[in-house]
Amino acid sequence: MDEQKRPRAWVYARIPGDYDGTMNSYKVCSMQALHDGCDIVGGSIDERDGWLLRPGYRDMLRQIKAGKVDRVYICRMRQVSGKERHLYSFFKRLMQHGAQVTATEYSLRDRVNMFRLARRVERYATRKGLQLPW
């Protein structure tokens, strides 16, 4: 594959209070990104619970906004947030900047379809003419 055509990936991991689990999650996501033919251009971890104390998450969003990331690798949605409004905001940011997200533990498309969140994201994508983030 042409080096310049390879998707640029960001790896993000967060399991509050579990450093070893967070690092294992990061490794699994990194291996999946490489297996999928991506160039890993960056990554971040957050060890804390809550929404405000997450510099790794904010760094990832800055890179997405700057157009430096094509795909984000996570193990599961809960690593981003357990709150639907935060996930919706995350998915919107990805769509606005043409990035996608891959979850290594399950099919993200199948998982979000189990919740109201999928319909909200699909309506937003249709209204704005954007590609879905998964």
Where are the regions a protein language model picked out?
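Short, structured surface patches at the beginning of a domain
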Residues: 1-134
